[in-house]
């Protein structure tokens, strides 16, 4: 079932309300959000979209491409946990990853800069390096 992204087809104010003249259009349809979750492996789904193109959705994520701004290098590292999600506090508890989510990786804390449900990949920028524990 599709999600309707059009307007309500009626005049909000002014004058007598009459039956609407517009009909719903297929190009107003949307889809449910992906809700990319943290898992032990990556799971991607290919979805056909308008125009015959394909969109890759990341359903489950284990790895992220993290850029270290100090050294200007990128590495594919494992995601350890979801720390915080400014978009919705409940997302962090449910381990849902969206753009802006702060994740804990093997390198340290990073903020997600890509849209996993739209791009099919998690890109992030390192904001706090992980402190090394002294051995002994």
Swiss-Prot record:
Give the GO terms filed under biological process for this record: translation
Pfam families xrefs: Ribosomal_S8e (PF01201)
Which residues does the annotated region (Disordered) include?
1-23
- Composition bias, kind Basic residues: at what positions? 13-23
Q: Which GO terms describe its cellular component?
A: ribonucleoprotein complex; ribosome
> Any keyword Protein biosynthesis?
no
| Keyword terms | Ribonucleoprotein, Ribosomal protein
**Recorded GO terms, molecular function?**
structural constituent of ribosome
Q: Which residues form the signal peptide?
A: none
Quaternary structure?
Part of the 30S ribosomal subunit.
Family statement: Belongs to the eukaryotic ribosomal protein eS8 family.
Name of this chain's protein: Small ribosomal subunit protein eS8
What organism is recorded for this protein?
Hyperthermus butylicus (strain DSM 5456 / JCM 9403 / PLM1-5)
Taxonomy of origin reads: Archaea, Thermoproteota, Thermoprotei, Desulfurococcales, Pyrodictiaceae
- List the gene name: rps8e
